[in-house]
Amino acid sequence: MARSGFEVQKVTVEALFLREIRTRFGKFRLGYLWAILEPSAHLLILLGILGYVMHRTMPDISFPVFLLNGLIPFFIFSSISKRSIGAIEANQGLFNYRPVKPIDTIIARALLETLIYVAVYILLMLIVWMTGEYFEITNFLQLVLTWSLLIILSCGVGLIFMVVGKTFPEMQKVLPILLKPLYFISCIMFPLHSIPKQYWSYLLWNPLVHVVELSREAVMPGYISEGVSLNYLAMFTLVTLFIGLALYRTREEAMLTS
């Protein structure tokens, strides 16, 4: 009995996922350690720089929990987007096998990055809790929906980056640079309400602001962020994914033959 297209893609993605693990980490455990050290180092540096100021301005909120729920979502978005750029070149030989498509490589990479950072998030939140910092998951459904939309959004941006990077090779070095400003305008280091309201309309165009603030609302009792919307995040995600899929559809054959 012939397999359906979905079953073929499922097997392909599973194989690519295992290949990504071997490529990313190899036989060494240092790769797994680095996945934990990178966000941990960011957390410690920002705690050292901003901890005292934030404790004065937000005395009732755990600053480590506040930071973690900004850093990890940004790392997920940044990592999936950037690792999608070279996905075709990294798997070029595999495309001789008909079932393997470029989009499968992005799905496999997105799954790996998601699993890594979700595990890191849980681990660091446990460490923060054991040090005496308080948090409570008050809206688990909101947290799951927000992060699910974040992953889909990242895949949509990844598709766009992959197509643009393959069509215009010189853009492969430019595209990661475009993500850098998002680190500073996505409310990672500061709450939205600390910005004057007249500037909110500009910041709220950024979907990552909604991801970060909704994540904080879900795990920090009493933290309420005006202006953010799960509906806006869902709409922005769907539009981005549609654009990514449309570009991929029109350029798939050209990318494989170029």
From Swiss-Prot:
Topology class, membrane: Multi-pass membrane protein
Keywords, alphabetical: Cell inner membrane, Cell membrane, Membrane, Transmembrane, Transmembrane helix, Transport
GO biological process: lipopolysaccharide transport
Compartments, record wording: Cell inner membrane
Topology feature Cytoplasmic, residues: 1-30, 82-108, 166-174, 248-258
Spans through the membrane: 31-54, 62-81, 109-132, 144-165, 175-195, 227-247
GO molecular function terms noted in the UniProt entry: ABC-type transporter activity
GO cellular component: ATP-binding cassette (ABC) transporter complex
Claim: Cell inner membrane is one of the keywords in the record: yes
Chain's role: KpsM and KpsT constitute a system for the transport of polysialic acid across the cytoplasmic membrane.
Family statement: Belongs to the ABC-2 integral membrane protein family.
Protein name stated in the entry: Polysialic acid transport protein KpsM
Taxonomic source organism: Escherichia coli
